[in-house]
Amino acid sequence: MTTPLMGVMPTSLRATLQNCSRGNQQEGLFSPKAMGRMAGQKDSTKPRDEVFHPHAAKDSLLATTLRWPVLSQQLSPPQTVPYVAWSGNIKDPSPYMKGCSLPMWSPCLDTKDVDSSVSSGRMSGSSGGHESCTLSHGPWKERPPLILGPQRQPRKSDPRLEQLRDKIRAQAQWQASCASLGTSAPSSASCLYKTSTMLWRKTPKVTNALPVPAFPGSGVLRTAEHRGKDRASLSLRRELSKVPQHHTSVPRTNFKKVKNASCKREISKSSILRRTAKGRGSDRKAAAVKASPAHTWLCKPMSAHSDQQVSKHTPSLAFQDQSATIHGAMETLQDLRQQIQAGLELTRSPRVDRKLSLSKPKPQNLVGKRDRGLQSTQDMQGSSKTAWTVTEGKNSSLHRAGNLHSQQHRKKALAEHESCPRRTWTGQGQDSSFPRPGSTPEKPRFFSQRPWSALARQTYPQRTWDAQGQDISVQKSGSSLKKPSPFSQRPWSALAGRAYSACEDREVFEPSPWNSLSRPHSALQDPWSNSFVQRSSPSSKGKSAVPPPSKVKPAWPEPSQDLLQSKPAKEQDTPCPRPRGSLGQQHSSESLRDFMRQKAQARRQQALEQKALAAHTLELRNQRLQEVYRKQREAVLGKDIPVVSQRRPGIVTFVPMQSGGMEAPGSLGSPREQTWSKVTSGMVLGDQEAPDSFCLCLNKPWNRIETQDTGRPLEGYKQARLQALETMAEALRQRVDILTTKLDKPTSPDTSGDLASDVLPLCPSTAPATPTLVPPSYLRTLMSKGGRESPRDLVDSQAEPLLLSTCFQDGEMLPWSPSWELPNPNLGTHIESQPQGPVSSTPASVSQVIPHTQSCPAGSSSHGALSKEAIQGLEKKLQREMATLQALGACMKSSLGMPDAPDPTRGSLWQEEMPEVKKEGLVTPWTTRSCGKGEPADRPWAGWSGGQGGLPWASSTA
């Protein structure tokens, strides 16, 4: 059915109809699908920007084909209409069909045979979204007017129609704001880019020629009728594009197709914008035509021709105006989305968030720095509101075109760097101005909100930085810059080589807000150079980044979002590094080594001091011990040791004790002043005569002066001992001789009885006892030899103690008395020894007889009477013996230098050993401990106590 029509149509229209026939078909205006579409359009709340009605386009097409074929060829040359005349914004048919009351003419053709369509730029942007109308064969007839009213027919579900609606919604969603502006159904990326690709492939064929409508007035009428609606919808879209879409999602894939599509639009944008004024004037004329319907039919063909040109170009002009606005809104939304994503990433990394919060400048500082900004940077950024915020179309078209063209670089890299935190120029206004070179940077954190951060060192080529190194001549004379190239001194210089290859293809930059940054030759007006010079001043020291070894402390600003795009993908996870502040005073390697050496030396010195202190403490302790040991040695070696037999250690020693002063050696003292005290005791085996006996050791003091010639204290001790033994032996020999002669004489019972009566009252025992003297073997030998033995022989016979025997009754013991007063001055001291039985360690008085536990040996008569003469003789003998013993004791003490013996009650071992004698009935074996119990330090030897040179009771009780 299309063959007869094609034969009449021009070539351009034939191509147009053939292209249009490939779209979706529609059965007619009043078909169920068309009525459903028109009824469903009443529910739509989306703004409609349609200019042409498909039936009006159909009428124009038929009129051009049948009546003015030549005119249609003249009106549609390829060079007059730009090939980008069709909007990518796919919309449903115009809602004006709901209330149009004007008659609409259509050819009397069958609505089901031939399909042809003319797409309006406002209604469809793809080849698949055309409204098809089938030509009917027959005369022209007038269509009934559309029914006005709120009645609504139910929409029938058609899969193809629904698919077409989805495509239209997807196109509208992408064109409006790429974030579902004015649409409710989300669109997939595949459908979006497939539709846009088909659009640009088929647009040149469609836009080659546009026919003039059959009735000239009808096209102008319908154009003027919906011009106000287009303006209202355009303003509404502008207002919607100004609203920041924080909750929308921008498609992040296949941005190269978007870039290519946008580039095709930019080519003919200048020619389109030149007709903006003409299009607006035609709008006014169309509005006037709408007021008088009769004037529509009286229009001349020339006016119809001009109106047709207006109707042909007006959709493109309006679309370009809206497209620029939409692109600006889309870029603003993308920037806002990047800011939101950067905020989320900063929230996930608290450490970077703290750095950003610390680096935010104060408003007053920003205002002051804006006033001091360079004019070149103001020219560089142009109008921030035009580039980054939605405007009302009042800015120049050239600036808008330059901004849109520069934004293509941003689209290309958005898919690669979505995760890196950025800062945009939105919300900062004219904050992009840098301080002047002579200004003092009070707040170094002013650069923290620049569109470029510290990562610009990784993205810009090195030649830009080298060119900045030549700006040192601009800096002030007080700056401390030493090296011209700061790029080699920065810690991130190694990373700049990575991004250099990514910037190789950007040799020529289009006009953009940061275009001056890409020109290394603009040294004096380069904000990088200005900031570098200003940052190099001494006033910024201590506040800028970590200085290099040359003490240069330049604080570099941050790169823009475009510059961040060349960062490798593997570095996206980590937050953008920024120059850290100075952590403190910087030290060189030599100073650090000196410090470490000083610390090590201090530690060694402390260890040495601790060792020295420990050694000193040990030395003091050793000195104290040595002092104690020395005193002990002096006490042992320098003092007299009691005569104790090494063979028979159980020797009981009695030392004479005086109540008065010591008498000179050899002088006889008063018997009343002499007492005895026990020093030590032990078990003595003795000889056959006295297996258990007492030994009286006359302790002659050792004279130090006399022993100086020998040089050894031990020799002096031996000399004193020998002297005491000789004196005692002589005295005992005389006494033994006298007593032996007395006892050998026959005594009468009276004498013996008197003697016993004199002796018994002095003893607590009831059994009388007769004292007898049993000389030991060595004394008998000495006496038999006539005293011809030398003192050396007496030393060898030290194991043979002197034995003084007397007989006491069993169980009798003389208690200790504090004072040993002599009741009878005529009585002497009887120190007796008993051959058998336990030994009593009780001291005896001079006038007392010490009782023992055994009876007297044979040969002594206990019940014999003694005459008075015998008693007197015994008394005289005892007195002589006491005088001799006293002289011997004085001699011993004077030679040994011993002080006067203290009172025996103040301390004596007799009290300690008295209970043992009572319990066991035996003499306690001699030990070293028995020589002064409780004071081992003061009694280092047996028999004596204390190292003071005195007797045992002097030190133990004093």
UniProtKB/Swiss-Prot annotation:
InterPro entries: CEP350/CC187. The keyword Coiled coil applies. Residues 116-132, 536-545 have a biased composition (Low complexity). This is Coiled-coil domain-containing protein 187. Residues 718-743 form a coiled coil. Residues 116-160, 345-447, 470-492, 510-602, 916-958 are annotated as: Disordered. Residues 374-398, 470-491 have a biased composition (Polar residues). GO terms for biological process: microtubule anchoring. GO terms for molecular function: microtubule binding. GO terms for cellular component: centrosome. Keywords: Coiled coil.
